[in-house]
Amino acid sequence: QDLPGTDNSTATLCLGHHAVPNGTIVKTITDDQIEVTNATELVQSSSTGKICNNPHRILDGRDCTLIDALLGDPHCDVFQDETWDLFVERSNAFSNCYPYDVPDYASLRSLVASSGTLEFITEGFTWTGVTQNGGSNACKRGPANGFFSRLNWLTKSGSTYPVLNVTMPNNDNFDKLYIWGVHHPSTNQEQTNLYVQASGRVTVSTRRSQQTIIPNIGSRPWVRGQSGRISIYWTIVKPGDVLVINSNGNLIAPRGYFKMRTGKSSIMRSDALIDTCVSECITPNGSIPNDKPFQNVNKITYGACPKYVKQNTLKLAIGMRNVPEKQTRGLFGAIAGFIENGWEGMIDGWYGFRHQNSEGTGQAADLKSTQAAIDQINGKLNRVIEKTNEKFHQIEKEFSEVEGRIQDLEKYVEDTKIDLWSYNADVLVALENQHTIDLTDSEMNKLFEKTRRQLRENAEDMGNGCFKIYHKCDNACIESIRNGTYDHDIYRDEALNNRFQIKGVELKSGYKDWILWISFAISCFLLCVVLLGFIMWACQRGNIRCNICI
């Protein structure tokens, strides 16, 4: 007898999700390696190789350092009164004036860089009894001897160098940066030739601070024909405060002040080409896109940049769990649902239906559940970026040799921060991936339960993501199930009748197996009884003797 399931009286409807032949491996909280249909890379690992000049204003230092431009080295005059968002120092920068040192070089460099301007205001300092505008053949401005344009080298006038005592109040409403210096002659003879006194002294003070410097006379390595040195110092004068300069020799006086500004300007060492392009994030390697939450290009950044992490790759799942389709099955050779495997080739949705009925086979996507999953996943990348991208800049840290312990501590702190962010990134991505897989599985289960509630007793769950429908269900009927308009009452009687017929035939077919097993058991029992009876009869006749030994 033919099963009713093989004629036009039944149909099969399977639910499933799409799959791809080769998925992407991602990490979740519970599994280090799980395959998904699609994932996006979260770590930016390469730069453009060039620094973009938009939207940030980039100032190329060329062959000048920021401090040389600040002091007014003759070959850096082009930078007078310049402004910037990011000052780019080049490795080929050099000084071309009187040799100098800055005891607090890193702090001054950082202070000026963050101000973002070299705007200079000349003030009328009165230096009585001394010669101004000293120069050196180590600092040529054209053919003549020159000096730093923002500093005034004071020497003796005739045979005297009086004690200088000059005050300059700050009557403005902004901070003023004064740059000054102390000259260290190479010999005692040079000291008296320039300043008369055998030992000079320079004191610069405000209401908040005071610095007193005694020159160190002695020969040093020759630089540009000079064995003397100048030490550069700086003082900030707040609004309402007063700058007081007292000296009896060796003073390199200020000519005015730099107007200090507050902002997020910075400085970076880089040899990357500056080009006309747009990029929010800049590293010494060049600009990088900021459409990813993490980067491992460089620790030093400027602008709205991804967080630096140690990982070379972090994959964010933007698709569901991937279970490739068993290729030996064929498209409908043995129709199966999502519990067994995914479906390849379903390009118009993530979830869908496959059916087999009297009109043949077919497939259609379920757009509603697909859209529900996509809506929840779409914002993930933006949310991760929002959690990690900040408008900040990680400047370079510089320390003198005597600050080695501070430098070691700073390096330890920075390395610890990177370790923490690398760990946080790993956990954050794993959590998001776990959530993505859980919600896509949930949408599949919701669609399956929705279909089950529609079919009720008109169909049977086959246990593999498919339903056996016990009534004739043409393509219009299948479509009503997909769009949620299916009325199970219309087909209930037919489904019950077909179900009983099919179950009855299955039951009758099952009796044959039971009868065979029962017949075999009875035959074995009768054979044992006959054999036992024969043995007992033979013993009574004496044909068989049985001895029992203890």
UniProtKB/Swiss-Prot annotation:
GO terms for cellular component: host cell plasma membrane; membrane; viral envelope; virion membrane. Residues 536-550 are cytoplasmic. Glycans are attached at residues 8, 22, 38, 165, 285, 483. One of its GO terms (biological process) is virion attachment to host cell. The keyword Transmembrane helix applies. Residues 1-514 are extracellular. The record marks 329-330 as: Cleavage. Keywords: Clathrin- and caveolin-independent endocytosis of virus by host, Clathrin-mediated endocytosis of virus by host, Disulfide bond, Fusion of virus membrane with host endosomal membrane, Fusion of virus membrane with host membrane, Glycoprotein, Hemagglutinin, Host cell membrane, Host membrane, Host-virus interaction, Lipoprotein, Membrane, Palmitate, Transmembrane, Transmembrane helix, Viral attachment to host cell, Viral envelope protein, Viral penetration into host cytoplasm, Virion, Virus endocytosis by host, Virus entry into host cell. Palmitoylated. In natural infection, inactive HA is matured into HA1 and HA2 outside the cell by one or more trypsin-like, arginine-specific endoprotease secreted by the bronchial epithelial cells. One identified protease that may be involved in this process is secreted in lungs by club cells. One of its GO terms (molecular function) is host cell surface receptor binding. It is a single-pass type I membrane protein. It is found in: Virion membrane; Host apical cell membrane. Disulfide bonds join 14-466, 52-277, 64-76, 97-139, 281-305, 473-477. InterPro entries: Capsid_hemagglutn (IPR008980), Hemagglutn_HA1_a/b_dom_sf (IPR013828), Hemagglutn_influenz_A (IPR000149), Hemagglutn_influenz_A/B (IPR001364). The chain crosses the membrane at residues 515-535. It comes from the Viruses. A lipid is attached at residues 539, 546, 549 (S-palmitoyl cysteine). The keyword Acyltransferase does not apply. Pfam families: Hemagglutinin. Major glycoprotein, comprises over 80% of the envelope proteins present in virus particle. The extent of infection into host organism is determined by HA. Influenza viruses bud from the apical surface of polarized epithelial cells (e.g. bronchial epithelial cells) into lumen of lungs and are therefore usually pneumotropic. The reason is that HA is cleaved by tryptase clara which is restricted to lungs. However, HAs of H5 and H7 pantropic avian viruses subtypes can be cleaved by furin and subtilisin-type enzymes, allowing the virus to grow in other organs than lungs. Belongs to the influenza viruses hemagglutinin family. Homotrimer of disulfide-linked HA1-HA2. Binds to sialic acid-containing receptors on the cell surface, bringing about the attachment of the virus particle to the cell. This attachment induces virion internalization either through clathrin-dependent endocytosis or through clathrin- and caveolin-independent pathway. Plays a major role in the determination of host range restriction and virulence. Class I viral fusion protein. Responsible for penetration of the virus into the cell cytoplasm by mediating the fusion of the membrane of the endocytosed virus particle with the endosomal membrane. This is Hemagglutinin. It comes from Influenza A virus (strain A/Duck/Hong Kong/64/1976 H3).
